[in-house]
Design a protein with these regions (language model features):
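Hydrophobic single-pass membrane-insertion segments
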Residues: 17-26
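N-terminal glycine/threonine-rich, aromatic-flanked beta-hairpin/loop signature
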Residues: 57-87
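Tryptophan-anchored aromatic micro-motifs
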Residues: 28-52
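Hydrophobic membrane-insertion alpha-helices, especially the h-region
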Residues: 6-16
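Short, surface-exposed coil-to-beta transition loops
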Residues: 50-55, 77-83, 110-115
Length: 166
């Protein structure tokens, strides 16, 4: 009887050892390698009959963002250009995200690289405006990034519609 008990105990130990050595195969994590495109557009008629137009296209891939922003006021020179930067996770308070980008803008025949913050979510987007200062290398940054004023609210649209509005 003692022999059988020892034999069962040895078999259980060997079985436990073999089972613990099994390799766990994890499924590979597949990252989305195709960007998500979001587009926004606004047109606001001024008292003089001229319209302020703004449109935005963003391509999101993880926490990176690229795109184009065009701000075309009715009575001032337009400011247009491409950008790239990072995008935050969803802020549960505002139910939106913030893109912090470097905008290569063109206005009045001059090209300037400047900081641009864009909030978006819940079907709209707004660009942040505030006093800008040269950080010493020709790149402009917000003097007080916590005191921005957000401009015209752009509504989400199909990206093909934005291209038609150019």
């Amino acid at each position: 009887m003692k022999k059988y008990l020892v034999l069962v105990l040895v078999v259980l130990i060997i079985l436990g050892y073999v089972l613990s050595k099994k390799e766990t195969v994890l499924a590979p994590v597949v990252e989305n390698s195709k960007p998500i495109s979001l587009c926004f557009y606004a047109q606001k008629l001024g008292v003089n009959g001229l319209s302020d137009v703004a449109w935005l296209k963003m391509n999101l891939l993880g926490d990176k963002v690229t795109g184009e922003f065009r701000n075309i006021p009715g009575e001032k020179d337009k400011k247009v250009g491409t950008f790239e930067g990072t995008v935050s996770k969803v802020d549960p308070y505002m139910m939106g995200r913030t893109a912090d980008v470097w905008w290569n803008s063109m206005a009045e025949g001059m090209q300037v690289k400047e900081q641009l913050k864009i909030t978006f979510g819940e079907g709209n987007a707004q660009a942040g405006y505030g006093e800008m200062v040269d950080r010493g290398d020709g790149v402009y940054v917000y003097k007080n990034p916590d005191q921005l004023t957000y401009g015209i609210s752009m509504t989400d649209v199909a990206c093909d519609d934005v291209r038609l509005a150019e």
